[in-house]
A protein has these predicted regions:
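Conserved acidic
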Residues: 1-234
Length: 234
């Protein structure tokens, strides 16, 4: 019985690999299977962008550079190509990276909970909806501002702010990174945050002082600004 169980497990793995390989061939024109599901997803996206005639480098602010290096094994100079952020993207990237914190995960109750009806609300298709909302952005024409209203609306914006929510605010929305890397959402403090977070905070009557802010505009229509990068992918 155990031998049969083991053989069955091997069969399941083999069948899964065969189907995954066929899926990869259909959607990426490649017979090799990436080691992870996310790797396969990236390959599918790149394949779809190529089919649409969309430049990955232009869309995401990358460029290909050629460098000359000394190869100790060959004992000679070799030429190597690499994909790197454009110079204009590189200017804002360190600051923008500080403003990204990932999802908000919190626990509001510790220990036994009261007997009651508990509701867990979720946004249907939140990730795919967020992806479809993204359009090409103009990395070369970013601009700085301390005007809080510039961060309201459909804006690609990032800022370092001092903030203070009203004392009776139950759930403040601006993230502050702790010394251990965790996130806190205090009534007041200093936050690296994004335009949507700023707009929500303003809607909660939060007092803001923008110390440093950058806006990266969407591309104009003639430069592909009307296209949705991930629409076909999702």
């Amino acid at each position: 019985a155990f031998e049969e169980y083991g053989m069955r497990d091997a069969e399941i793995a083999a069948r899964y690999y065969q189907k995954l390989k066929a899926f990869a061939e259909t959607h990426t024109d490649s017979s090799s299977v990436p080691a992870t599901a996310s790797g396969l997803a990236v390959r599918i996206l790149l394949s779809q962008l190529e089919q649409q005639g969309t430049s990955f480098h232009e869309t995401f602010g990358f460029e290909e550079r050629t460098g000359v290096y000394w190869n100790n094994v060959k004992g000679s100079v070799v030429t190597r190509k690499s994909t790197v952020p454009t110079e204009m993207r590189s200017i804002t990237e360190p600051f923008v990276s500080k403003c990204y914190h990932g999802g908000r995960n919190e626990c509001y109750t510790f220990g036994p909970t009261p007997v009651s009806v508990w509701n867990d609300f979720d946004l249907a298709g939140a990730y795919t909806t967020g992806l479809v909302d993204l359009r090409p952005i103009d990395y070369d024409n970013f601009w700085y501002t301390k005007d809080e209203r510039a961060f309201v609306g459909h804006v690609v914006g990032f800022a370092l702010v001092d903030f203070e929510f009203p004392a009776d605010t139950k759930f403040p929305c601006l993230p502050v990174e702790g010394s251990n890397g965790g996130l806190f959402y205090p009534l007041s403090g200093r936050s690296y945050c994004t335009a949507p977070e700023i707009e929500v905070a303003l809607g909660m009557n939060c007092s803001l002082n923008i110390l440093h802010g950058v806006i990266i505009p969407w591309c104009d229509a003639e430069d592909g600004g009307d296209s949705r990068i991930f629409e076909e992918f999702t």
